[in-house]
């Protein structure tokens, strides 16, 4: 992420027996927002099978979760190994995990209430699940088989690791924005596309929470990004300009992923901070930016980057004005704020 508080009063019904949680407005009742809690059943299976052989414990988890959301954990030895490791970790320490499960309902309700100030008609287009991600994500959308089902997944284990503080609600705003933005802007492979998606998600959080810290904006994972990028600002701008329309994953990884091998001393995920600056350089508010489709967004993103480059007096070339052919993603890569 990927990697935000409160308009209307909200109440929460947390139904652990079936794993279904409902967040609804109390008085003037907008449609209820539901999420399914799969994190608690995972832990219940872990506790109930404590002391049994690993194979039996893994099978019990799979049976319990598959009955609620088939295909969440793909078949295979690699997934089984991660389930086993997660079961062991829960047997050692589950307090942070439990706290994440407990904090999630209020944080989600607060994020939705705040989000609706800018996007009053918002309702999640995807079913939302809280689950044990086996160390894979704190949040993001994904496609599950069978049936190519599109879902929104929040990982209680990585929420416990990265957002066990005042960054949880801002993080949820970041992810809610991705859902809203996807109504107008399609996933595509070029660096500028992914940079634009993450840029606007950070800008949305900054707009809705004007006093947000860099920690709340996810600009300190895995270490502080802003100052380190400012020190190499020209390098960051020239990298994005040179790879603006690159459709291979290497440039996107370098700019936006942890462990992505950023160039020339730039920090991991430097693109999140550069993207925030780029979004702000457009001079447009987040509501208007969110409604641009791919064709309309590229020239605005390109012009904002060119402005930043002019302000920084860099000598490298700006991206071409003419639109590149956009390669649409067919599967919809997960966007997780990371």
Predicted regions and their residues:
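Bacterial N-terminal signal peptides that target proteins for export
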Residues: 2-14
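Bacterial N-terminal signal peptides
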Residues: 11-23
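Sec/Tat signal peptide C-region and signal peptidase I cleavage site
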Residues: 23-29
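N-terminal mature-domain "stem" immediately C-terminal to a signal peptide or N-terminal signal-anchor/transmembrane
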Residues: 29-84
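Acidic/His-rich structured neighborhood in mature extracellular/periplasmic domains
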Residues: 85-223
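Small-residue-rich helix-loop
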Residues: 218-237
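Pan-zinc metallopeptidase signature
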Residues: 236-327
């Amino acid at each position: 992420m990927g990697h935000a508080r409160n308009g209307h009063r909200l109440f929460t019904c947390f139904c652990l027996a079936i794993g279904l949680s409902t967040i609804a407005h109390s008085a003037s009742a907008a449609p209820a927002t539901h999420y399914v809690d799969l994190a608690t059943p995972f832990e219940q299976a872990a506790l109930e099978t404590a002391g049994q052989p690993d194979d039996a414990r893994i099978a019990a988890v799979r049976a319990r979760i598959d009955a609620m959301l088939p295909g969440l954990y793909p078949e295979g030895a690699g997934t089984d190994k991660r389930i086993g490791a997660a079961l062991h970790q829960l047997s050692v320490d589950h307090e942070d995990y439990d706290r994440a499960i407990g904090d999630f309902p209020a944080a989600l309700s607060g994020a939705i209430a705040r989000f609706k100030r800018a996007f009053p008609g918002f309702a999640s287009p995807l079913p939302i699940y809280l689950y044990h991600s086996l160390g894979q994500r704190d949040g993001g959308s994904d496609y599950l088989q069978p049936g190519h089902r599109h879902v929104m997944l929040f990982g209680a284990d990585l929420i416990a690791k990265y957002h066990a503080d005042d960054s949880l609600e801002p993080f949820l705003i970041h992810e809610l924005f991705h859902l809203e933005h996807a109504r107008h802007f399609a996933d595509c492979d070029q660096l500028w596309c992914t940079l634009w998606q993450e840029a606007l998600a950070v800008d949305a959080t900054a707009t809705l929470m004007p006093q947000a810290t860099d920690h709340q904006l996810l600009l300190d994972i895995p270490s502080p990004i802003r100052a380190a990028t400012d020190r190499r600002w020209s390098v960051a701008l020239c990298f994005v300009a040179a790879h603006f329309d690159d459709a291979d994953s290497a440039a996107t990884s370098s700019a936006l992923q942890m462990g992505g091998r950023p160039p020339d001393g730039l920090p991991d995920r430097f693109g999140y901070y550069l993207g925030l600056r780029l979004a702000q350089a457009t001079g447009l508010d987040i509501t208007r930016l969110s409604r641009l489709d791919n064709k309309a967004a590229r020239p605005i993103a390109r012009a904002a980057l060119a402005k930043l480059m002019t302000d920084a007096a860099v000598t490298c070339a700006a991206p071409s004005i003419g639109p590149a052919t956009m390669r649409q993603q067919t599967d919809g890569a997960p966007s997780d704020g990371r």
